[in-house]
Amino acid sequence: MYRTRTCGDLRLADEGLVVTLAGWVQKTRKMGGMTFVDIRDRYGITQLVFNQEVDAALCEKANKLGREFVIQVTGTVRERSSKNAHIPTGDIELIVSELNVLNTALTPPFTIEEETDGGDDLRMKYRYLDLRRACVRKNLELRHRMAFEVRRYLDEQGFLEVETPVLVNSTPEGARDFVVPSRMNPGQFYALPQSPQTLKQLLMVSGFDRYFQIVKCFRDEDLRADRQPEFTQIDCEMSFVEQEDVLNMFEGMAKHLFKVIRGVEFKESFMRMTWQDAMKQYGSDKPDLRFGMKFVELMDIMKGHGFSVFDNAAYIGGICAEGAASYTRKQLDALTEFVKRPQVGAKGLVYARVEADGNVKSSVDKFYSQEVLQEMKNAFGAKPGDLILILSGDDAMKTRKQLCELRLEMGNQLGLRDKDKFVCLWVIDFPLFEWNEDDQRFYAMHHPFTSPNPDDIPLLDTDPGAVRANAYDMVINGVEVGGGSIRIHDSQLQDKMFKLLGFTEERAQEQFGFLMNAFKYGAPPHGGLAYGLDRFVSLFAGLDSIRDCIAFPKNNSGRDVMLDAPGVLDPAQLDELNLIVDIKK
């Protein structure tokens, strides 16, 4: 037996016990004739003591230990004279009587502690060392607990966990697929699933009623802090349900996770907001409601006063930052540069301060009387000490999105985006279609199987762009953690949907014939939702990137720098797969 206890569970009550521990050397330090060694495992750290006067040979052996050596020690638990309140084992130490070096180690390329000197690339290259850090390991422990609680909740609600295939057919709609060549079928390819969407619908046709799966999904798309080429979904589907049934079920799951994992209890139902209102009031379909700064439209007030930027604009809108009138000219110039960055794309920024006497001082004073500025102030409900920031443009939707970026930046600067505060809402009534000007055709905003709102079905023939989807997203703190819809279960309605999306009958049959055929054998009304487990965990952990809650993530170029993947295939493998690599310069 390598150990009788772990490095994190000894306490004062264990004083006098003889125990054996095993783990990694965190650090060593010498003080006079004493050597102190911190031994670490997944469970914690324990201080070891070696005494030169008691056993000189053993102490000399301890002096030769390096960082990250793997050791086994046996000794007696004793109360520490100098206690460490920062660790659970800080009241005790182990007086070592026996030391075995199980493995030596090279000097690590970075310090394996809470605060490390390793950059992102270095830590990803040596991810197996980075995972020894307690702060990283805790994220994966949190992930385990959340996945466990998801399974427990859904099991109690009658869901069955069913695995679906990883090798499926490619579907050109949506993000790019990762493709896998088939050796046994030369010239043909599998695709890795972007989601088990059609397969879980088939399970509903099969009569499984309630399905879930914690499943890997794959999308070959450009990466951001909240995206990875492979990610994990909590994928769910239910039969004989309407939208309200799905929302209640998965709001219940979110509340369960918050209560059990974070100790946060939501007694009220989550807020609901239409997509139209979210875009109009916050410029985003995933608004962060931890703070205010709701958009105020100023077309009626600010147009027609000789300021050509506003007079020629299709949209004028602004936000009110409470207490920010103290912003200096330098800070305001920095905000102007922020909105003019290519990532935001605004042409400029107009600001107005509400002075202590209630008067308004703006950057466009020469065009506006105090009477007009007071009317603007009242539209915001602004008070003395507040700062009003205004953007305008010739495209209302685009300008709202720019204003959204400014709002989030102000939220950051004013410390209003507290990671320990959670505001949850459902965004509902999404458009069913998005119009693409370049292609001159509609695309599904979610996917082709999303059911239209029953009230809007007649509009499919007359005004498809006005049709609302029976779809919903769960948004927490400005992060879309989950989304889903009620699905089409009628083959005739599905045919109409494909036609509106530009599918020929042959193409629809080729790509989705298996699903259309299944519908002919009695498909129940059904709907579902998928949570992004990575995003959910990063939200609970207060992380800025989902990479930190994935054991072996890819970098922003989609590479695994530890495995050096993707890599070049051996020519013999290419021959076996009947493939030729011809990279276009």
From Swiss-Prot:
EC number of this enzyme: 6.1.1.12
Residue positions binding ATP: 219-221, 228, 480, 532-535
Chain segments annotated as transmembrane: none
Keyword Cytoplasm: yes
Localization, UniProt: Cytoplasm
Chief site of localization: cytoplasm
Subunit architecture: Homodimer.
Family, per entry: Belongs to the class-II aminoacyl-tRNA synthetase family. Type 1 subfamily.
Protein name (database record): Aspartate--tRNA ligase
Organism: Parabacteroides distasonis (strain ATCC 8503 / DSM 20701 / CIP 104284 / JCM 5825 / NCTC 11152)
